[in-house]
Design a protein with these regions (language model features):
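Electropositive polyanion-binding surfaces
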Residues: 1-187
Length: 187
């Protein structure tokens, strides 16, 4: 079962605190609404454009890249622009959510240097090419992002197991998507 942004909620507490007899229900978040698509495309455009602007000015940023869409080719982070095959862009620098991600804030500092200093931005930007602190930020973010993904996976697994136990489901028909990942046919 794929639980992409699955929602787990407890029914039966009628707005009060947990009583211990709540029932778990699981549903998937519906995606693909026109507004979701507009926002996603606007973010891709902004992050790609700003990443290109950093590169044009010789200012390092924190980029996400993916060399190919072949199975097993992962997204990587680095300080130099590189294509992101999954998004179909020449470069992609997270920059649009500085309140959610420190990486975006760092990139915005670099973008502000470009806006204020133009051709001399590389001299004025907070982080210079091959800056050890910038590499440290990338490394720290990679570790935190990986830990977050593992934690999210654990939460989804926990609530799925709770649901299966409450429903007394002991067998499922499923399709193997790839090594160790299956999707339930009728859950």
């Amino acid at each position: 079962m794929l639980l992409d942004h699955a929602r787990a909620k407890c029914d039966g507490n009628h707005g009060g605190g947990p009583q211990g007899d709540e029932r778990v229900s699981i549903s998937t978040r519906q995606r693909g609404a026109p507004l979701d698509l507009i926002v996603a495309e606007a973010m891709i455009l902004a992050n790609s454009t700003w990443g290109g602007w950093l590169a044009e000015h010789g200012v390092p940023g924190i980029y996400r890249s993916q060399a190919s869409m072949l199975p097993g080719v992962k997204v990587r982070m680095g300080t130099k622009p590189a294509p992101h095959a999954g998004m179909g862009v020449a470069q992609y620098a997270w920059s649009t959510s500085p309140l959610r991600r420190y990486v975006d804030l760092v990139n915005q500092w670099q973008i502000i240097a470009c806006a204020r200093h133009g051709r001399t931005a590389a001299l004025a930007a907070p982080f210079k090419p091959k800056d050890a602190m910038l590499f440290s930020i990338v490394s720290s973010f990679d570790a935190a992002y990986s830990a977050y993904g593992d934690f999210q996976h654990g939460i989804e697994r926990y609530w799925t197991i709770q649901y299966l136990a409450q429903q007394q489901i002991t067998e499922l028909d499923a399709v193997e998507m790839k090594d160790g990942l299956v999707r339930a046919d009728n859950l």
